[in-house]
Curated annotation (Swiss-Prot):
It catalyses: N(6)-(dimethylallyl)adenosine 5'-phosphate + H2O = N(6)-dimethylallyladenine + D-ribose 5-phosphate; 9-ribosyl-trans-zeatin 5'-phosphate + H2O = trans-zeatin + D-ribose 5-phosphate. Residues 1-26 are annotated as: Disordered. Cytokinin-activating enzyme working in the direct activation pathway. Phosphoribohydrolase that converts inactive cytokinin nucleotides to the biologically active free-base forms. Keywords: Cytokinin biosynthesis, Hydrolase. Its EC number is 3.2.2.n1. This is Probable cytokinin riboside 5'-monophosphate phosphoribohydrolase LOGL9. It comes from Oryza sativa subsp. japonica (Rice). Substrate binds at residues 117, 135-136, 152-158.
Length: 227
């Protein structure tokens, strides 16, 4: 575990190169050819997946179970986790699941939240930044795809922002909602309403995918073709 301060002049523990999957070195065809069939799970075409989620666990056990299942799915596919750096709630659940499975965890957290979202030992490598804006930008830069578990205002803002970035052509990375027990039905209904009323182009309804469980969602992310 290594914590970098925003005042640290040189951070060597984490590779700063963008986590971009190029057509030349990590194409879908190569990923399929290099499929890891252990447990019937294919190795992913992603190096790192960013997970947005709550610093609370929610009232349903299914939310925590989904976070753990997602972490195990990433480990099975040999995908690193990028997340908000906290040890509480669903953030802690998914990070612990990845670390306990032998996967690599990269957390990005503002200095002001260290005392609020971290208790005890941090999970994996922690990159400490100066602001929420830096946190979101760094998480996005390091990731090849995005997943939103259930969460509150912060989670909703984070996932909607990366969908908006896709709409603006800022990135072409897959975005997925892990719709546990219909948690994101309201957001799906909102998007359908916005499309019907002319605020979102029909083609942009497909800027993200959703599924009720981690294996199904990750499969959709793997198959995603940018709009």
């Amino acid at each position: 575990m290594y914590i970098s301060s925003p005042h640290t002049s040189h951070f060597t523990s984490i590779d700063r190169s963008p986590a971009v999957v190029s057509e030349s070195d990590r194409s879908m065809e190569e990923a399929a050819a290099a499929a890891d069939m252990n447990g019937g799970v294919h190795q992913s075409r992603f190096r790192r997946v960013c997970v947005f989620c709550g610093s609370s666990s929610g009232k349903r056990r299914s939310y925590r179970d989904a976070a753990v299942e997602l972490g195990k799915e990433l480990v099975a596919r040999k995908v690193d986790l990028v997340y908000g750096g906290g040890s509480l709630g669903l953030m802690g659940e998914v990070a612990e699941a990845v670390r306990n499975g032998g996967g690599h965890v990269i957390g990005v957290i503002p200095t002001t939240l260290m005392g609020k979202e971290v208790t005890g030992e941090t999970v994996g490598e922690v990159r400490e930044v100066g602001s929420m804006h830096e946190r979101k930008a760094e998480m996005a830069r390091r990731s090849d795809a995005f997943v939103a578990l259930p969460g509150g205002y912060g989670t909703l803002e984070e996932v909607v922002e990366v969908i908006a970035w896709a709409q603006l052509g800022i990135h072409a990375k897959p975005v997925g909602l892990l719709n546990v027990d219909g948690y994101y039905d309201f957001l799906l209904a909102f998007v359908d309403k916005a499309v019907a009323d002319g605020f979102i182009p029909p083609s942009h309804r497909h800027l993200f995918v959703s599924a009720p469980d981690a294996p199904s969602l990750v499969h959709k992310l793997e198959e995603y073709v940018p709009v």
